[in-house]
Protein backbone atom coordinates (compact mmCIF):
# COMPACT_ATOMS: atom_id res chain seq x y z
CA UNK A 1 0.00 0.00 0.00
CA UNK A 2 1.37 3.40 -0.99
CA UNK A 3 1.50 5.88 1.88
CA UNK A 4 1.96 9.63 1.40
CA UNK A 5 3.18 12.15 3.93
CA UNK A 6 2.15 15.76 4.21
CA UNK A 7 4.85 18.38 3.84
CA UNK A 8 5.05 21.75 5.57
CA UNK A 9 6.21 24.49 3.22
CA UNK A 10 7.04 28.13 3.92
CA UNK A 11 6.18 30.58 1.13
CA UNK A 12 8.08 33.71 2.13
CA UNK A 13 8.60 35.84 4.13
CA UNK A 14 10.71 37.06 1.21
CA UNK A 15 9.07 35.70 -1.88
CA UNK A 16 8.68 37.53 -5.20
CA UNK A 17 4.94 36.94 -5.39
CA UNK A 18 4.03 38.46 -2.01
CA UNK A 19 5.04 42.07 -2.85
CA UNK A 20 6.06 42.70 0.72
CA UNK A 21 7.27 40.68 3.66
CA UNK A 22 4.56 38.08 4.16
CA UNK A 23 4.84 34.41 5.09
CA UNK A 24 2.36 31.75 4.14
CA UNK A 25 2.78 28.39 5.87
CA UNK A 26 1.14 25.71 3.76
CA UNK A 27 0.61 22.02 4.42
CA UNK A 28 0.64 20.07 1.16
CA UNK A 29 -0.14 16.49 0.21
CA UNK A 30 1.51 15.99 -3.16
CA UNK A 31 0.45 19.11 -5.03
CA UNK A 32 -2.77 19.72 -3.08
CA UNK A 33 -2.88 22.36 -0.34
CA UNK A 34 -4.45 20.91 2.79
CA UNK A 35 -4.02 23.95 5.01
CA UNK A 36 -2.72 27.51 4.68
CA UNK A 37 -1.80 29.85 7.53
CA UNK A 38 -0.84 33.48 6.85
CA UNK A 39 1.88 34.85 9.14
CA UNK A 40 1.83 38.64 9.27
CA UNK A 41 3.42 41.43 11.28
CA UNK A 42 6.80 41.79 9.57
CA UNK A 43 5.94 45.39 8.59
CA UNK A 44 4.10 46.35 11.78
CA UNK A 45 5.23 49.80 12.92
CA UNK A 46 2.56 50.68 15.46
CA UNK A 47 1.14 53.52 13.37
CA UNK A 48 -1.99 53.94 15.46
CA UNK A 49 -0.08 54.15 18.75
CA UNK A 50 2.52 56.53 17.30
CA UNK A 51 -0.33 58.77 16.10
CA UNK A 52 -1.44 59.35 19.70
CA UNK A 53 1.71 61.43 20.27
CA UNK A 54 1.56 63.35 16.97
CA UNK A 55 -0.29 66.44 15.85
CA UNK A 56 -2.94 65.73 13.22
CA UNK A 57 -0.87 67.15 10.35
CA UNK A 58 2.10 65.02 11.44
CA UNK A 59 0.04 61.83 11.07
CA UNK A 60 -0.45 62.32 7.31
CA UNK A 61 3.05 61.07 6.27
CA UNK A 62 2.46 57.90 8.30
CA UNK A 63 -0.67 57.12 6.27
CA UNK A 64 1.45 57.26 3.09
CA UNK A 65 3.30 54.20 4.32
CA UNK A 66 0.30 51.96 4.93
CA UNK A 67 -0.99 51.31 1.41
CA UNK A 68 2.06 52.77 -0.30
CA UNK A 69 0.61 51.97 -3.75
CA UNK A 70 -2.34 54.26 -3.09
CA UNK A 71 -1.02 56.86 -0.67
CA UNK A 72 -3.43 59.61 -1.77
CA UNK A 73 -6.52 57.79 -0.51
CA UNK A 74 -4.79 57.17 2.83
CA UNK A 75 -3.92 60.86 3.07
CA UNK A 76 -7.52 61.72 2.36
CA UNK A 77 -9.17 59.46 4.94
CA UNK A 78 -7.33 60.97 7.94
CA UNK A 79 -7.96 64.52 6.69
CA UNK A 80 -11.62 63.71 6.02
CA UNK A 81 -12.06 62.39 9.57
CA UNK A 82 -10.59 65.53 11.17
CA UNK A 83 -12.55 67.80 8.81
CA UNK A 84 -15.75 65.98 9.75
CA UNK A 85 -15.08 66.61 13.44
CA UNK A 86 -14.25 70.28 12.84
CA UNK A 87 -17.12 70.86 10.39
CA UNK A 88 -14.79 72.35 7.77
CA UNK A 89 -15.94 73.38 4.31
CA UNK A 90 -13.32 72.48 1.70
CA UNK A 91 -12.64 74.89 -1.20
CA UNK A 92 -13.95 73.72 -4.59
CA UNK A 93 -10.57 73.75 -6.29
CA UNK A 94 -9.07 71.64 -3.50
CA UNK A 95 -11.87 69.07 -3.81
CA UNK A 96 -11.20 68.65 -7.53
CA UNK A 97 -7.46 68.34 -6.97
CA UNK A 98 -8.11 65.69 -4.33
CA UNK A 99 -10.35 63.66 -6.64
CA UNK A 100 -7.88 63.92 -9.52
CA UNK A 101 -5.02 62.81 -7.26
CA UNK A 102 -6.99 59.90 -5.79
CA UNK A 103 -8.29 58.61 -9.12
CA UNK A 104 -4.90 58.86 -10.82
CA UNK A 105 -3.54 56.97 -7.82
CA UNK A 106 -6.26 54.33 -8.21
CA UNK A 107 -5.30 53.78 -11.86
CA UNK A 108 -1.60 53.56 -10.94
CA UNK A 109 -2.37 51.07 -8.18
CA UNK A 110 -4.40 48.83 -10.50
CA UNK A 111 -1.61 49.00 -13.08
CA UNK A 112 0.86 47.67 -10.50
CA UNK A 113 -1.59 44.89 -9.66
CA UNK A 114 -2.13 44.02 -13.34
CA UNK A 115 1.55 43.92 -14.20
CA UNK A 116 2.82 42.08 -11.13
CA UNK A 117 -0.07 39.60 -11.01
CA UNK A 118 0.56 38.57 -14.60
CA UNK A 119 4.31 38.46 -14.06
CA UNK A 120 3.78 36.04 -11.17
CA UNK A 121 1.79 33.62 -13.33
CA UNK A 122 4.30 33.73 -16.16
CA UNK A 123 3.54 36.70 -18.45
CA UNK A 124 6.50 39.08 -18.59
CA UNK A 125 5.55 41.73 -21.17
CA UNK A 126 2.38 43.05 -19.38
CA UNK A 127 4.58 43.99 -16.43
CA UNK A 128 6.69 46.23 -18.67
CA UNK A 129 3.66 47.88 -20.28
CA UNK A 130 1.95 48.48 -16.92
CA UNK A 131 4.98 50.19 -15.45
CA UNK A 132 5.40 52.31 -18.58
CA UNK A 133 1.92 53.81 -18.07
CA UNK A 134 2.30 53.95 -14.30
CA UNK A 135 5.46 56.00 -14.74
CA UNK A 136 3.44 58.62 -16.60
CA UNK A 137 0.98 58.87 -13.70
CA UNK A 138 3.79 59.01 -11.15
CA UNK A 139 5.37 61.86 -13.11
CA UNK A 140 2.05 63.75 -13.07
CA UNK A 141 1.71 63.29 -9.31
CA UNK A 142 5.36 64.24 -8.85
CA UNK A 143 4.67 67.53 -10.65
CA UNK A 144 1.67 68.10 -8.40
CA UNK A 145 3.24 67.43 -5.02
CA UNK A 146 6.97 66.79 -5.44
CA UNK A 147 6.95 63.10 -4.53
CA UNK A 148 6.61 59.84 -6.44
CA UNK A 149 5.26 57.34 -3.92
CA UNK A 150 4.68 58.76 -0.44
CA UNK A 151 3.01 62.03 -1.33
CA UNK A 152 2.08 63.82 1.92
CA UNK A 153 -0.12 66.04 -0.28
CA UNK A 154 -3.46 66.30 1.51
CA UNK A 155 -3.96 68.70 4.39
CA UNK A 156 -6.77 69.19 6.87
CA UNK A 157 -8.86 71.74 4.98
CA UNK A 158 -7.60 71.03 1.45
CA UNK A 159 -4.27 70.31 -0.22
CA UNK A 160 -0.73 71.57 0.27
CA UNK A 161 -0.09 72.99 -3.22
CA UNK A 162 -2.10 74.17 -6.18
CA UNK A 163 -1.63 72.47 -9.56
CA UNK A 164 1.30 73.92 -11.54
CA UNK A 165 0.68 75.67 -14.87
CA UNK A 166 -0.17 73.21 -17.63
CA UNK A 167 -0.77 70.29 -15.26
CA UNK A 168 -4.51 69.98 -15.94
CA UNK A 169 -3.81 69.95 -19.69
CA UNK A 170 -1.31 67.10 -19.22
CA UNK A 171 -3.87 65.10 -17.26
CA UNK A 172 -6.41 65.74 -20.01
CA UNK A 173 -3.98 64.42 -22.64
CA UNK A 174 -3.26 61.32 -20.56
CA UNK A 175 -6.89 60.10 -20.54
CA UNK A 176 -7.26 59.16 -24.25
CA UNK A 177 -3.72 57.75 -24.26
CA UNK A 178 -4.52 55.48 -21.31
CA UNK A 179 -7.78 54.34 -22.91
CA UNK A 180 -5.87 53.30 -26.01
CA UNK A 181 -3.33 51.36 -23.93
CA UNK A 182 -6.12 49.71 -21.93
CA UNK A 183 -7.63 48.37 -25.15
CA UNK A 184 -4.20 46.97 -25.98
CA UNK A 185 -4.02 45.28 -22.57
CA UNK A 186 -7.29 43.48 -23.30
CA UNK A 187 -6.06 42.40 -26.74
CA UNK A 188 -2.86 41.06 -25.20
CA UNK A 189 -4.20 39.34 -22.09
CA UNK A 190 -7.95 39.32 -21.49
CA UNK A 191 -8.74 36.95 -24.37
CA UNK A 192 -5.62 34.83 -24.01
CA UNK A 193 -6.59 31.17 -23.69
CA UNK A 194 -3.70 30.28 -21.40
CA UNK A 195 -4.50 33.18 -19.06
CA UNK A 196 -8.21 32.30 -19.00
CA UNK A 197 -7.38 28.72 -18.03
CA UNK A 198 -5.34 30.04 -15.10
CA UNK A 199 -8.05 32.32 -13.66
CA UNK A 200 -11.53 31.07 -14.62
CA UNK A 201 -13.13 28.99 -11.90
CA UNK A 202 -10.17 29.53 -9.54
CA UNK A 203 -10.60 30.93 -6.02
CA UNK A 204 -14.40 31.06 -6.01
CA UNK A 205 -16.45 32.38 -3.08
CA UNK A 206 -20.05 33.54 -2.77
CA UNK A 207 -21.49 36.97 -1.98
CA UNK A 208 -22.57 35.68 1.45
CA UNK A 209 -19.04 34.50 2.21
CA UNK A 210 -17.57 37.81 1.01
CA UNK A 211 -19.86 39.74 3.34
CA UNK A 212 -19.23 37.41 6.29
CA UNK A 213 -15.46 37.89 5.85
CA UNK A 214 -15.93 41.72 5.63
CA UNK A 215 -14.40 41.84 2.16
CA UNK A 216 -14.62 45.09 0.22
CA UNK A 217 -13.55 46.62 -3.06
CA UNK A 218 -13.19 44.35 -6.09
CA UNK A 219 -13.00 41.35 -3.75
CA UNK A 220 -16.62 42.03 -2.77
CA UNK A 221 -17.96 43.31 -6.08
CA UNK A 222 -16.66 40.27 -7.99
CA UNK A 223 -19.44 38.23 -6.35
CA UNK A 224 -22.19 40.49 -7.72
CA UNK A 225 -22.55 42.82 -4.73
CA UNK A 226 -22.88 46.34 -6.11
CA UNK A 227 -21.25 48.35 -3.32
CA UNK A 228 -18.84 51.25 -3.77
CA UNK A 229 -18.70 54.11 -1.26
CA UNK A 230 -18.12 56.65 -4.03
CA UNK A 231 -21.66 55.82 -5.22
CA UNK A 232 -23.47 54.45 -2.18
CA UNK A 233 -22.19 56.92 0.42
CA UNK A 234 -20.69 59.74 -1.71
CA UNK A 235 -17.94 61.79 -0.08
CA UNK A 236 -15.96 64.75 -1.38
CA UNK A 237 -17.56 65.66 -4.76
CA UNK A 238 -18.08 62.16 -6.19
CA UNK A 239 -21.81 62.79 -6.51
CA UNK A 240 -21.03 65.22 -9.36
CA UNK A 241 -19.58 62.55 -11.63
CA UNK A 242 -21.24 60.02 -13.90
CA UNK A 243 -19.56 56.62 -13.62
CA UNK A 244 -20.50 52.97 -13.21
CA UNK A 245 -19.53 50.35 -10.64
CA UNK A 246 -18.20 47.15 -12.25
CA UNK A 247 -19.50 43.94 -10.66
CA UNK A 248 -18.92 40.26 -11.34
CA UNK A 249 -21.17 37.24 -10.93
CA UNK A 250 -19.11 34.12 -10.18
CA UNK A 251 -16.63 35.46 -7.61
CA UNK A 252 -13.55 33.82 -9.12
CA UNK A 253 -10.10 35.19 -10.03
CA UNK A 254 -11.38 36.10 -13.51
CA UNK A 255 -14.19 38.25 -12.09
CA UNK A 256 -11.73 40.03 -9.82
CA UNK A 257 -9.52 40.68 -12.85
CA UNK A 258 -12.43 42.07 -14.90
CA UNK A 259 -13.66 44.29 -12.05
CA UNK A 260 -10.27 45.94 -11.60
CA UNK A 261 -9.70 46.42 -15.32
CA UNK A 262 -13.12 48.03 -15.68
CA UNK A 263 -12.41 50.20 -12.64
CA UNK A 264 -9.49 51.72 -14.54
CA UNK A 265 -11.91 52.77 -17.29
CA UNK A 266 -14.36 54.22 -14.75
CA UNK A 267 -11.57 56.16 -13.03
CA UNK A 268 -10.63 57.60 -16.42
CA UNK A 269 -14.24 58.77 -16.78
CA UNK A 270 -14.04 60.52 -13.41
CA UNK A 271 -10.69 62.14 -14.27
CA UNK A 272 -12.07 63.31 -17.61
CA UNK A 273 -15.12 64.92 -15.98
CA UNK A 274 -13.07 66.45 -13.16
CA UNK A 275 -10.77 68.10 -15.71
CA UNK A 276 -13.76 69.50 -17.59
CA UNK A 277 -15.35 70.86 -14.40
CA UNK A 278 -12.10 72.08 -12.83
CA UNK A 279 -12.50 75.60 -11.34
CA UNK A 280 -10.38 78.24 -13.08
CA UNK A 281 -9.31 79.81 -9.78
CA UNK A 282 -9.85 79.71 -6.05
CA UNK A 283 -8.17 78.70 -2.81
CA UNK A 284 -6.81 75.20 -2.25
CA UNK A 285 -6.80 75.31 1.56
CA UNK A 286 -9.53 76.39 3.95
CA UNK A 287 -8.75 78.82 6.75
CA UNK A 288 -7.57 76.55 9.54
CA UNK A 289 -5.45 77.30 12.61
CA UNK A 290 -1.73 76.51 12.38
CA UNK A 291 -2.10 73.99 15.19
CA UNK A 292 -5.21 71.93 14.56
CA UNK A 293 -7.23 70.76 17.53
CA UNK A 294 -10.22 68.55 16.85
CA UNK A 295 -13.14 69.25 19.21
CA UNK A 296 -13.99 66.75 21.94
CA UNK A 297 -15.88 63.80 20.56
CA UNK A 298 -15.43 61.03 18.06
CA UNK A 299 -15.88 60.44 14.35
CA UNK A 300 -15.67 57.55 11.92
CA UNK A 301 -15.40 58.03 8.17
CA UNK A 302 -14.84 55.54 5.37
CA UNK A 303 -13.89 55.89 1.72
CA UNK A 304 -13.22 53.64 -1.28
CA UNK A 305 -9.55 52.87 -1.82
CA UNK A 306 -8.23 50.66 -4.68
CA UNK A 307 -8.15 47.74 -2.24
CA UNK A 308 -11.55 48.36 -0.69
CA UNK A 309 -13.12 50.20 2.19
CA UNK A 310 -10.60 52.14 4.27
CA UNK A 311 -11.94 53.75 7.44
CA UNK A 312 -10.60 56.09 10.10
CA UNK A 313 -11.92 56.40 13.65
CA UNK A 314 -10.78 59.31 15.81
CA UNK A 315 -11.55 59.92 19.47
CA UNK A 316 -10.55 63.41 20.56
CA UNK A 317 -10.25 65.01 23.99
CA UNK A 318 -9.83 68.47 22.46
CA UNK A 319 -6.02 68.43 22.29
CA UNK A 320 -3.77 68.75 19.26
CA UNK A 321 -3.16 64.99 19.26
CA UNK A 322 -5.88 62.32 18.97
CA UNK A 323 -6.78 60.46 22.15
CA UNK A 324 -7.27 57.33 20.02
CA UNK A 325 -6.94 56.68 16.31
CA UNK A 326 -7.94 53.50 14.49
CA UNK A 327 -7.73 52.61 10.80
CA UNK A 328 -9.88 50.04 9.06
CA UNK A 329 -7.36 48.62 6.62
CA UNK A 330 -9.05 46.74 3.74
CA UNK A 331 -6.04 44.55 2.90
CA UNK A 332 -6.09 43.14 6.46
CA UNK A 333 -9.73 42.07 6.11
CA UNK A 334 -9.39 40.84 2.54
CA UNK A 335 -6.50 38.59 3.58
CA UNK A 336 -8.71 36.66 6.03
CA UNK A 337 -10.41 34.66 3.28
CA UNK A 338 -7.11 33.37 1.84
CA UNK A 339 -6.90 30.15 3.96
CA UNK A 340 -10.40 29.18 2.83
CA UNK A 341 -9.62 29.84 -0.84
CA UNK A 342 -6.38 27.84 -0.77
CA UNK A 343 -7.67 24.74 1.02
CA UNK A 344 -8.01 21.90 -1.48
CA UNK A 345 -6.44 23.89 -4.32
CA UNK A 346 -3.52 22.81 -6.46
CA UNK A 347 -0.30 24.53 -5.37
CA UNK A 348 0.04 25.95 -8.91
CA UNK A 349 -3.04 28.10 -8.20
CA UNK A 350 -1.61 29.58 -4.99
CA UNK A 351 0.00 32.59 -6.67
CA UNK A 352 -3.04 33.20 -8.89
CA UNK A 353 -5.34 33.32 -5.86
CA UNK A 354 -3.00 35.43 -3.71
CA UNK A 355 -2.45 37.90 -6.54
CA UNK A 356 -6.19 38.16 -7.16
CA UNK A 357 -6.87 39.18 -3.56
CA UNK A 358 -4.40 42.07 -4.06
CA UNK A 359 -3.02 42.83 -0.61
CA UNK A 360 -0.41 45.42 0.33
CA UNK A 361 1.60 44.36 3.34
CA UNK A 362 2.19 47.86 4.68
CA UNK A 363 -1.57 48.12 5.05
CA UNK A 364 -2.04 44.60 6.41
CA UNK A 365 0.46 45.14 9.24
CA UNK A 366 -0.25 48.80 10.01
Curated annotation (Swiss-Prot):
The UniProt keyword set, sorted, is: Cell membrane, Membrane, NAD, Quinone, Translocase, Transport
The family database entries (Pfam families) matched by this protein are listed as: Complex1_49kDa
User: What domain of life does the UniProt record list for this protein's source?
Assistant: Bacteria
Q: Give the way it sits in the membrane.
A: Peripheral membrane protein
Instruction: Output one GO MF annotation.
Output: quinone binding
Entry-linked InterPro entries = NADH_Q_OxRdtase_suD (IPR001135), NDH1_su_D/H (IPR022885), NiFe-Hase_large (IPR029014)
A GO cellular component annotation here is: plasma membrane
Q: What is its EC number?
A: 7.1.1.-
> Where is this chain's protein located in or outside the cell?
Cell membrane
Region forming the signal peptide: none
Give the reaction(s) catalysed: a quinone + NADH + 5 H(+)(in) = a quinol + NAD(+) + 4 H(+)(out)
Gene3D superfamilies per the UniProt record, alphabetical: Cytochrome-c3 Hydrogenase, chain B
Main function: NDH-1 shuttles electrons from NADH, via FMN and iron-sulfur (Fe-S) centers, to quinones in the respiratory chain. The immediate electron acceptor for the enzyme in this species is believed to be a menaquinone. Couples the redox reaction to proton translocation (for every two electrons transferred, four hydrogen ions are translocated across the cytoplasmic membrane), and thus conserves the redox energy in a proton gradient.
What HAMAP family has UniProt attached to this entry? NDH1_NuoD
Q: Say which family it is in.
A: Belongs to the complex I 49 kDa subunit family.
Quaternary state and interactors: NDH-1 is composed of 14 different subunits. Subunits NuoB, C, D, E, F, and G constitute the peripheral sector of the complex.
Quote the protein name from its UniProt record.
Answer: NADH-quinone oxidoreductase subunit D
Species, as recorded: Bacillus cereus (strain ATCC 14579 / DSM 31 / CCUG 7414 / JCM 2152 / NBRC 15305 / NCIMB 9373 / NCTC 2599 / NRRL B-3711)
> Gene that codes for this?
nuoD
Amino acid sequence: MIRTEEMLLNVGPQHPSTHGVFRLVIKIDGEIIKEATPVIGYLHRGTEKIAESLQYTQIIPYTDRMDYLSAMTNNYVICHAVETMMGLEIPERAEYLRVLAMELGRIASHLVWWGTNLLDIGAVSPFLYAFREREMIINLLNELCGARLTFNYMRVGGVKWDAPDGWIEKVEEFVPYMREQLAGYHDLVSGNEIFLNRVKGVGIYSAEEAISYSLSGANLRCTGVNWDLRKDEPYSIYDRFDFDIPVGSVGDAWDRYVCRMQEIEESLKIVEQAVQQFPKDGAVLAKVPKIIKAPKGEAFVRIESPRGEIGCYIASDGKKEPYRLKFRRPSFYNLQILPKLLKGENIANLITILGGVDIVLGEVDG
